[in-house]
From Swiss-Prot:
Cellular localisation: Cytoplasm
Family, similarity comment: Belongs to the UvrC family.
Protein's organism: Pseudomonas entomophila (strain L48)
Alphabetic keyword roster: Cytoplasm, DNA damage, DNA excision, DNA repair, Excision nuclease, SOS response
Domain of life where this protein originates: Bacteria
Gene Ontology molecular functions: DNA binding; excinuclease ABC activity
Quaternary data: Interacts with UvrB in an incision complex.
UniProt cross-references to NCBIfam families, sorted A to Z: PRK00558.1-5, uvrC
Name of the protein in question: UvrABC system protein C
Length: 607
């Protein structure tokens, strides 16, 4: 048995300088990372005999070792603390769950550039606008730009293989650059207007469009004037929706709200006086449950944890914390930019602040209510399946394909708080007979649980398989083969009517068949997970199928680049006509030699 931590001996040698401390348990697992102006004073507060909050007392009870790192000042300590939290994600720290990269609007290079959504490393050549608080905010901006200026948003592979305009051209949301229906000069002007909007210069853009409209009207070019009039009206409507009264500059309005059981931080992004969007964050609450502690932890992780994240000039917050000065100094050190944090604001800015507080409160209350509802369903499922404990992790699998084409298996994961989307997985199924769902499911389970056997990932408490007796038997064989024979399996088969509420369930083997009443909370949970697995499989299948159908077999031919491929398709009128052509006919196309024609013909008829 390990010796209890000797706090007195540790504190006797502890420095009183600024720094970072790390607390470990008996198995050397990092429990908590903190910073302090005075390490000795801060650490002594953990080991007093009375007055500790329950979570803090639980943390102290697990401490077996404490390590400290002395820093030159509090700002340096804050930066080191955030680095360690991001790397190790200690269980007793406040943690942002949503740490994925934020989306940008991407404008590609080229004569006819495209607009699209981009996440991750900025490797592609072009311009990036953002980041936006959510993909929904970007889609809203892209939809507006498509209606107003008709800059293409299709993938380059799709664009390069067009021989006639697509539906977007027919509904006047694209000008058909793929088939030469717009000049490079006219398209460049539409791109320039789109860039002005994305840069927040909407007022200047509106004035410019007004001047162009008057000029077109004076020249009796009424069709062009009407087009500009519609663009101006659309722009004004968006300005009315997005501009905050009295707003200007770049501001993030951040409000934190804490209730027993959780916390929510609501962020409203305002750029150039225009609202780009808003987003809710639900951080994992550690030992600090005060709203000011949640706010300080959020600001540190959000603005210091990602060097690429766009930094506003000002933050408006609903609470104050002693760390705010250190945070602004750390931003200056790390980002080379000044940041002000305001709390006491008036007028319009006070209304922004209150709006963020209201949104945070409502979002947290809704989340807690949903969590209680979900927890009740998990308890009902435990009773139905006669489990000793309420399950904490459910996995469900489904298969999707179109007559065997582009087969995809999905894995969705649920816990008592709802879907765990970061744990979702898709599997592109290869090497099985087209349309063989059993073989596809077998491959997906082998891949998933083979990794779990190797130490990657977590084993669920219950495995749901959509498909009935055959799929359940196959899943049981895979689990026994991999050494997970004790795992609870639940097969879900549609009833005779194939309507929701009439599902037939199989527990562990086909002999244990049963049904549940339509109003059963356990059945509702099963249906929810099954439907989510189905949705996730279908979206993955459609994406894979669409990519395969957009990819031309010409793309694999050496010497046939995008321009030559496009010219070749235009010459023959499409891929179908090119497929019918002989080698001699292909060689007659402009720029195609006999040798290249043979390569093209071989590629088109390789199957």
């Amino acid at each position: 048995m390990s010796q209890p931590f000797d706090a007195s001996a540790f504190l006797a040698t502890c420095s009183g300088r600024p720094g970072v401390y790390r607390m470990f348990d008996a198995e050397a697992r990092l429990l908590y990372v903190g910073k302090a102006k005075n390490l000795k004073k801060r650490l002594a507060s953990y080991f007093r005999k009375t007055g500790l909050a329950p979570k803090t007392a639980a943390l102290v009870g697990r401490i077996a070792q404490v390590e400290t790192t002395i820093t030159a000042n509090e700002t340096e300590a804050l930066l080191l603390e955030q680095t360690l939290i991001k790397e190790w994600r200690p269980p007793y720290n406040i943690l942002l769950r949503d740490d994925k990269s934020y989306p940008y609007v991407f404008l590609s290079d080229g004569e006819f550039p495209r607009l699209g959504i981009h996440r991750g490393a900025k490797k592609a050549k072009g311009r990036y606008f953002g980041p936006y608080p959510s993909a929904g905010a970007i889609r809203e901006s892209l939809s507006l730009l498509q209606k107003a200026f008709s800059v293409r948003q299709c993938e380059d592979s799709y664009y390069a293989n067009r021989t006639r305009p697509c539906l977007q051209y027919q509904i006047k949301r694209c000008k058909g650059p793929c088939v030469g229906l717009v000049t490079p000069e006219e398209y460049a002007e539409d791109v320039r207007h789109s860039v002005m909007f994305l840069e927040g210069r909407s007022q200047q853009l509106g004035n410019e469009l007004n001047a162009e409209m008057e000029k077109a009207a004076m020249a009796l070019n009424f069709e062009k004037a009407a087009e500009l009039r519609d663009q101006i009206a659309l722009l004004r409507r968006v300005q009315d929706q997005q501009y905050m009264e009295g707003g200007s500059g770049d501001v993030d309005v951040v409000a934190a709200f804490v209730n027993p059981g959780g916390a929510c931080v609501h962020l409203i992004s305002v750029r150039g006086g225009r609202v780009l969007g808003s987003k809710n964050f639900f951080p994992q609450v550690g030992i600090e449950e005060e709203v000011a502690e949640v706010m300080a932890a959020f600001l540190s992780q959000y603005y210091l944890g990602n060097a690429e994240r766009e930094l506003p000039g000002e933050l408006i917050v609903n609470v104050v914390h002693e760390d705010f000065d250190a945070i602004t100094e750390a931003v200056q050190t790390l980002r080379g930019r000044e940041l002000s944090i305001s709390h006491r604001v008036r007028g319009t800015r006070a209304r922004w602040q209150q709006l963020a507080v209201t949104n945070a409160e409502q979002a947290l209350n809704a989340r807690l209510a949903n969590r209680q509802h979900m927890a009740a369903r998990f308890e009902a499922l435990a009773q139905v399946l006669d489990l000793d404990e309420v399950p904490q992790r459910l996995e469900c699998y489904d298969i999707s394909h179109s007559s065997g084409e582009a087969t995809v298996a999905s894995c969705v994961v649920f816990g008592p708080e709802g879907p765990l989307k970061s744990d979702y997985r898709r599997f592109n199924i290869e090497g099985v007979t087209a349309g063989d769902d059993y073989a596809a499911m077998h491959q997906a389970l082998q891949r998933r649980y083979g990794r779990i056997k190797d130490g990657e990932g977590k084993l669920p408490d219950v495995l749901l398989v959509d498909g009935g007796k055959g799929q359940l038997n196959m899943a049981r064989d895979v689990m026994q083969e991999l050494g997970f024979g004790d795992l609870t399996l639940l097969g879900v088969a549609k009833g005779v009517t194939r309507k929701a509420g009439f599902e037939t369930l199989y527990l562990n083997d086909v002999a244990h068949e049963f049904t549940l009443k339509g109003d059963s909370p356990a059945l509702h949970l099963i249906q929810q997970i099954r439907d989510e697995a189905h949705r996730f499989a279908i979206t993955g299948h459609r994406a894979r199928r669409g990519k395969a159908r957009r990819t031309s077999s010409l793309e694999d031919v050496a010497g046939v680049g995008p321009k030559r491929r496009r010219d070749l398709l235009k010459h023959f009128g499409g891929l179908q006509e090119l497929n019918r052509a002989s080698i001699d006919e292909i060689a007659k196309a402009p720029g195609i030699s006999k040798k290249l024609a043979e390569s093209i013909y071989a590629s088109l008829h390789s199957e």
